[in-house]
Amino acid sequence: MYLLFIILMYLLPFSFQTSEPAYDKSVCDSGNKEYMGIEVYVEATLDEPLRQTTCESEIHKYGASVSNGGLNISVDLLNCFLNFHTVGVYTNRDTVYAKFASLDPWTTEPMNSMTHDDLVKLTEECIVDIYLKCEVDKTKDFMKTNDNRLKPRDFKTVPPSNVGSMIELQSDYCVNDVTAYVKIYDECGNIKQHSIPTLRDYFTTKNGQPRKILKKKIDNC
């Protein structure tokens, strides 16, 4: 009986192990197509505490958007030949964190496949257009001083000198600071012998200094 107990205790940890799904990654063997992935992170700090709202997201061809906390963040991919498959968001006091990402080609349809010519155009012309729109009634932001109405800042366009090679960003009147990060990578890079170099772009209004972007707490919306 004691021997049986020892055997069961030895086998118990293995009985709870979960194996990863076996995906067919032969799609990466295609000689005339490349499979590129994309991740876009946006961190936006508003000028007042966030409203309690339900997260809503939409994914469309070459772009996606998410709304939460009184802010809508939309991302459009121009000349990138890429699509998003997931959208996530996390809020904390006065800040919205959003993530837009694609999935590996062996896990989802449609795939982000492109020809070599498309890849060249991507590296030269891809624009990640990020637009932050406030969903708070603008009439609430008017203030009266000596019976004169003071108009809020309608739109704040980021100076071109601060924009990276891929990111173009425009924020609405309620946004104080924005940080954005873009990564375009070879989804088959860990499988094939020669991978395509990763493209990265980073932008922040925080004195141009890189900041750590919160990623782990972002949940799918």
From Swiss-Prot:
Its main location: secreted. Residues 1-17 form the signal peptide. It comes from the Viruses. Gene3D superfamilies: Major secreted virus protein. The gene is OPG170. Induction: Expressed in the early phase of the viral replicative cycle. SUPFAM superfamilies: Soluble secreted chemokine inhibitor, VCCI. Glycans are attached at residue 72. This is Protein OPG170. May interact with several cellular chemokines to interfere with chemokine-glycosaminoglycan (GAG) interactions at the cell surface to alter chemotaxis of nearby responsive cells. It is found in: Secreted. Belongs to the orthopoxvirus OPG170 family.
